[in-house]
């Protein structure tokens, strides 16, 4: 067990990588410990670190494909085994590593018959293809396949609106998340007032960076977020008579949403982000992919709207309703309003 292998220091806070492996080119795993921590500190650090790992680290993706010979996304091309949609989905799965800023152009230009893989992508020097064996398409006849690509570096999700492009450009939904998953667990030891904790942090990445690199980048991002609070020369603002404070009243969404908007109290809901709630990761990710980031965004949707979200289930809607009732005494209408 890790407890037997780790020598816990009672004075200096230390971290250590206790397990690291590469399951394949697109799946890395790392397990880390941080100790000794006072009671409650491990959970505080673990929650913040997990959110930073999943939401604050930048990744590189293919965000657009262009070919003037393609009539629409769901068409089939003679001599190519896959449909255009399947090719776009394969391009979405390509794992890239880069230090670029903004967007860069890349391309694929091959002649069949042959298998087209990520190795056939002609990319800028600043972009590295992690797994060159990733499949893109199968050309069954002696035809030319030329596709222009757009590569971006960003964070989170970038959901494209599906449409038939007139200039042959086809946006690709991008998931700029090099960390596939992150978990934390806590081991307590000691008795009474001497009780301390060890934080275990597990990280899975897509191979574009190692779990150790992800841990370092997430830590830097958290530090950058807290640095403004350390500025000693900031003015002290004193609020008198509750000026500029907005209370969250108990109300029913159906009856008083219009009144809340007239009074401009929706600003309070704009300041409450959905990652502050108790939503499970799958539900949270579905909402983020639909550009629902704040409580106000959520309240602008009905239960019917939520059920239209891809991979959303009735159980997810019930869980959201329970959280809204528990913390805000708010309801969502069943149908559009």
Curated annotation (Swiss-Prot):
Gene3D superfamilies: 5' to 3' exonuclease, C-terminal subdomain (1.10.150.20), DNA-directed RNA polymerase, insert domain (2.170.120.12), RNA polymerase, RBP11-like subunit (3.30.1360.10). It is an enzyme of class 2 (transferase). InterPro entries: DNA-dir_RNA_pol_insert, DNA-dir_RNA_pol_RpoA/D/Rpb3, DNA-dir_RpoA, RBP11-like, RNAP_asu_C, RNApol_insert_sf. Its EC number is 2.7.7.6. It is found in: Plastid, Chloroplast. Residues 1-232 are annotated as: Alpha N-terminal domain (alpha-NTD). Pfam families: RNA_pol_A_bac, RNA_pol_A_CTD, RNA_pol_L. GO terms for cellular component: chloroplast; DNA-directed RNA polymerase complex; mitochondrion. Belongs to the RNA polymerase alpha chain family. In plastids the minimal PEP RNA polymerase catalytic core is composed of four subunits: alpha, beta, beta', and beta''. When a (nuclear-encoded) sigma factor is associated with the core the holoenzyme is formed, which can initiate transcription. DNA-dependent RNA polymerase catalyzes the transcription of DNA into RNA using the four ribonucleoside triphosphates as substrates. The N-terminal domain is essential for RNAP assembly and basal transcription, whereas the C-terminal domain is involved in interaction with transcriptional regulators and with upstream promoter elements. This is DNA-directed RNA polymerase subunit alpha. It comes from Buxus microphylla (Littleleaf boxwood). The gene is rpoA.
């Amino acid at each position: 067990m890790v407890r037997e292998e780790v020598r816990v220091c009672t004075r200096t806070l230390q971290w250590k990588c206790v397990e690291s492996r590469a399951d394949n080119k697109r799946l890395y795993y790392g397990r880390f410990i941080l100790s000794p921590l006072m009671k409650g500190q491990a959970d505080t650090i673990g929650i913040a670190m997990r959110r930073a790992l999943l939401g604050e680290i930048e990744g590189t993706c293919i965000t657009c494909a262009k070919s003037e010979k393609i009539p629409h996304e769901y068409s089939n091309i003679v001599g190519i085994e896959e449909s255009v949609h399947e090719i776009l989905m394969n391009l979405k799965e390509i794992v890239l590593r880069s230090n670029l800023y903004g967007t860069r152009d890349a391309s694929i230009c091959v002649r069949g018959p042959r298998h087209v893989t990520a190795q056939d992508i002609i990319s800028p020097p600043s972009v590295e293809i992690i797994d060159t064996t990733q499949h893109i398409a199968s050309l069954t006849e002696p035809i030319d396949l030329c596709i222009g690509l757009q590569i971006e570096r960003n964070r989170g999700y970038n959901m494209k609106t599906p449409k038939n492009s007139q200039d042959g450009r086809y946006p690709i939904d991008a998931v700029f998340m090099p960390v596939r998953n992150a978990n934390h667990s806590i081991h307590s030891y000691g008795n009474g007032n001497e009780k301390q904790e060890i934080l275990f942090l597990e990280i899975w990445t897509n191979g574009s960076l190692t779990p150790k690199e992800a841990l370092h980048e997430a830590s830097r991002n958290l530090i950058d977020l807290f640095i403004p609070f350390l500025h000693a020369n900031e003015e002290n603002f004193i609020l008198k008579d509750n000026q500029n404070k907005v209370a969250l009243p108990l109300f029913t969404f159906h009856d008083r949403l219009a009144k809340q908007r007239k009074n401009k109290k929706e600003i309070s809901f704009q300041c409450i982000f959905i990652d502050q709630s108790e939503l499970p990761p799958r539900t949270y990710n579905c909402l983020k992919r639909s550009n629902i980031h704040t409580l106000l965004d959520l309240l602008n949707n009905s239960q019917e709207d939520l059920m239209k979200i891809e991979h959303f289930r009735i159980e997810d809607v019930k869980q959201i309703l329970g959280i809204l009732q528990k913390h805000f005494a708010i309801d969502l209408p069943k149908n559009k309003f």
